Amino acid sequence: MKYELKDDYIELFKLLKVLDLVDSGAQAKMIIAEGYVKRNSEIETRKRAKIIAGDTIEVADVIIEVII
């Protein structure tokens, strides 16, 4: 799956919401805090991590490529 950035970055929890991978912001924050999300193959626990073009996000079996 690809996500095209509209700005310079998007916060991680907002990306999960925009792509409908979670039902709410609270759920997004919970799965991030519990270590279920990887950024560039490393576990990312910062809910507001700035995701930029070139990043790859993994949630369960979904892989998201962030592009410009």
For the regions a language model picked out, list residue spans one by one.
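Generic alpha-helical hydrophobic packing signal
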Residues: 4, 36, 56-58
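Well-ordered beta-strand positions in beta-sheet-rich domains
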Residues: 2, 48, 63-65
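A basic, amphipathic helix-loop patch mediating RNA/tRNA/ribosome contacts
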Residues: 10-53
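Residue-level marker of intrinsically disordered, low-complexity segments enriched
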Residues: 8, 16, 62-64
